Amino acid sequence: MRKRVARKPNEALESVLEEAEQNLLAAFAKSQKTKHRGLKGNARAKSIADFLTARLPAAYGVATGAEVVDYADRRSGEIDIVIFDKQRNPVVSADPLWIAAETLLAYIEVKTKLTVGELNKSFIGAKQINALRPFKRPFTLAGQPDAGATDNEQLRCFRTVFAFGTNLGCKGWLDNEWSRIKKAAVFASVTPASIDRVLVLNRGMLNPPSQTGTDQFAVSSVFQQWVFNLVNFLARENGRRPAWDWQLYAKSKIPGWRAL
């Protein structure tokens, strides 16, 4: 058996992500100085969206304050940040900002402080995503494949709750946060796997589909781990996701054609 060799950290990449994390915290602190709640939320979402826009490949669109709509006019409600393939898929509408469910690859809900109420709202939002029918079929949740579809037909959407803090104390935080995540899922009548990651920037990260979590900052920044998770997911999912067909959203009756 070969002895495993510890991998040398990539200092260049780590320094970029560490700087980005500090910039997010600085943007959060700056937003605290405004008394307008809407402006606070917009500033925090924009700081994350700007980071992703600058570092994701140009093919990806990163938008804030968007709503996702499917062929039957089911809608998600406004989402803080959405990520989609803008190279192959145009937006449905720029004002208001609508994107087709078929183009949605990931979304992020940004929270100032994670509380029971905010978790409840996040899982209700996830339930609205579950109700969408991209390509006339549901999104597949992590760890819960659709038995009636092939691997290439499974449609995934990476869902994140990104919080700058939590109202829970440090002692036993990971277990306590997981406990109320499960309760929030029950509140919304969905499975905890309806959200892929719950990231608390100053505390740790939970992976509800695998029922695991970490608060070990000394090993690696949870922000870095989240970025890696997101980027790897986008590369896998977008590589097999078909392009959106406008015809899916056309009127049920279209003009007939005849030979000339």
Language-model-detected regions and their locations in the chain:
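Intrinsically disordered, low-complexity Ser/Thr/Pro/Gly-rich regulatory segments
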Residues: 1-78, 83-260
